[in-house]
Amino acid sequence: MGVTVETIQPGDGKNFPKKGDTVTMHYTGTLQNGSVFDSSVRRNEPFVTQIGVGRVIKGWDEGVLQLSLGQKANLICTPDYAYGPRGFPPVIPPNATLNFEVELLKIN
């Protein structure tokens, strides 16, 4: 249970976000069956958020803190680190394990 980080492309290995930092990243979220439910890449608009402070799902709050600048990775979030038993109707079903391909573009 939790979040698993699988590196696709390494980052700089030096610059990591800290709790409270604002990060800019691209992501594509998929369900276990491979269907895409959201993508900043498709919108061509990077996602900006404060990380580690509860503004995003727990899987992101913990997973993104493990990424270094420029890193591309899969964040695999179990339901307890995603949307849990409620899901996010109608897009995400209850108790869904989610996969996010993320790229950390900037740490502000």
Curated annotation (Swiss-Prot):
Record keyword Cytoplasm present: yes
Regulation: Inhibited by both FK506 and rapamycin.
GO molecular function: peptidyl-prolyl cis-trans isomerase activity
Enzyme class: isomerase
Keywords: Cytoplasm, Isomerase, Rotamase
InterPro entries: FKBP-type_PPIase, PPIase_dom_sf, PPIase_FKBP_dom
A cellular component annotation (GO) from this entry: cytoplasm
A Pfam cross-reference name: FKBP_C
Protein name (database record): FK506-binding protein 1
Species whose genome carries this gene: Rhizopus delemar (strain RA 99-880 / ATCC MYA-4621 / FGSC 9543 / NRRL 43880)
